[in-house]
């Protein structure tokens, strides 16, 4: 998924300023110039260091974190150990002059300050934008402090929550000189961005000039199903007495021993995959799937707790800063994203919106819902990778 970053550097300077990017264009592998052909490897290692653009260092960016109190009623309803997320935090990087502002929506379960929003922030800041980084509606901080129903996955609701956050950011930063508004998101954040842009067509608060969707899921159910299945991958060397984590840790240990030092970063991951200790396809698939399972567990746990559903945490169970949440998180780890949809999202959708079948829900939360808008709007630009693991049959044709 993350191997869009090299092309995003080009898009950052060009795409948002172009007049019309609605025409689809395939880029062959040779012209693309990306050296990793394995989609799992590209997802984990990201763009090789030598292909990354020169970007400003964090200390050279005028930036600051801010907080918003959007759900004051939850301040006393949430457990004490949720104190860090009773207010929604975001990051603003400002230019020293009037400039366009771009909102960046993080991917599945991601915090506003995670690695991809940080990368995109530097990219667009260097191009002259004010930049606002927002957490994903599926992150526990957003769910607790900004989401009305704390049950992410119904895209229209998620877009409404994001839109309210963006309006609150603009109100809080009323003295910031903004010439135009832009919007981008990656992975699930790109799907969110599409729905936010569509919402803005009727509410007209921002009149986004351009919207850039980076590697969006087309069919949300297909995407999460593909990722859920990765955790079931059969990996050589894993037995009842030797876990997947022990296999990966032993490989990393041998790698660092040969290197003579320990330094974990994106460049290291790329170099690691060029070494003899490199992860196999099965190990990489398991690693990606496991990461997604942790995100799904976070969503299931937080949604259940905020709404007092009692599926994971007993509704009246006393939780304070000293309470261990490990038993509940272990229970949440047994629930993949499809389980979360079945037990929490679909019941909420049916109760609140008189929803029907799973097929109806999938059509309402996926890009299919916006097909005419995406086709007709000249402001929407999409960048995707043909071998992205979140895509299913027919998805590229849709784009």
Question: Residue spans of the language-model regions?
Answer:
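N-terminal cap/lid segment of alpha/beta-hydrolase-fold proteins
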Residues: 29-97
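Short, surface-exposed "cap/lid" segments of acyl-processing enzymes
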Residues: 93-140, 393
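Alpha/beta-hydrolase active-site loop
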Residues: 151-173
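Gly/Ala-rich beta-loop-alpha elbow adjacent to hydrolase catalytic centers
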Residues: 184-193
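Alpha/beta-hydrolase-fold enzymes
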Residues: 199-323
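Active-site nucleophile elbow and catalytic-triad environment of alpha/beta-hydrolase enzymes
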Residues: 351-372
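Conserved alpha/beta-hydrolase "acid-adjacent" motif
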Residues: 362, 389-395
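Short beta-strand/loop motif that positions the catalytic acidic residue
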Residues: 376, 382-384
């Amino acid at each position: 998924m993350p191997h869009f970053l090299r092309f995003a550097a080009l898009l950052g300077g060009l795409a948002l300023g172009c007049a019309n990017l609605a025409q689809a264009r395939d880029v062959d592998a040779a012209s693309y110039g990306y050296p990793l052909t394995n989609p799992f490897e590209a997802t984990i290692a990201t763009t090789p260091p030598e292909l990354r653009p020169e970007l400003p260092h964090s200390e050279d960016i005028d930036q600051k974190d801010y907080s918003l109190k959007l759900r004051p009623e939850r301040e006393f309803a949430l457990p004490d150990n949720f104190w860090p997320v009773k207010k929604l935090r975001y990051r603003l990087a400002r230019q020293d002059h009037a400039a366009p502002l771009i909102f960046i929506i993080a991917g599945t379960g991601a915090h506003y300050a995670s690695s991809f929003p940080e990368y995109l922030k530097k990219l667009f800041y260097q191009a002259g934008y004010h930049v606002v980084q927002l957490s994903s509606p599926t992150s526990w901080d957003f769910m607790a402090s900004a989401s009305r129903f704390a049950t992410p996955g119904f895209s229209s609701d998620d877009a409404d929550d994001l839109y309210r956050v963006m309006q609150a950011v603009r109100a809080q930063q009323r003295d910031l000189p903004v010439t135009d508004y832009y919007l981008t998101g990656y992975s699930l954040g790109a799907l969110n961005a599409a729905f936010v842009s569509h919402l803005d067509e009727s509410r007209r608060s921002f009149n986004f000039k351009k919207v850039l969707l980076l590697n969006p899921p087309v069919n949300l159910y297909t995407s999460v199903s593909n990722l859920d299945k990765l955790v079931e991958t059969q990996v050589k060397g894993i037995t009842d007495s030797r876990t997947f984590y022990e296999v990966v840790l032993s490989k990393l240990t041998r790698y660092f021993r040969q290197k003579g030092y320990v330094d974990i970063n994106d460049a290291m991951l790329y170099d690691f995959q060029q070494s003899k200790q490199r992860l196999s396809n099965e190990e990489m698939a398991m690693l990606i799937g496991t990461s997604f399972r942790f995100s799904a567990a976070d969503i299931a746990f937080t949604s259940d707790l905020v709404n007092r559903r009692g599926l994971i945490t007993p509704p009246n169970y006393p939780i304070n800063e000293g309470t261990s949440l490990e038993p509940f998180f272990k229970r949440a780890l047994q629930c993949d994203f499809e389980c979360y949809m079945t037990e929490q999202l679909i019941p909420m959708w049916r109760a609140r919106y008189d929803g029907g079948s799973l097929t109806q829900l999938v059509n309402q939360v996926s890009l299919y819902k916006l097909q005419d808008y995406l086709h007709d709007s000249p402001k929407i630009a999409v960048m995707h990778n043909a071998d992205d693991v979140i895509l299913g049959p027919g998805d590229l044709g849709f784009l």
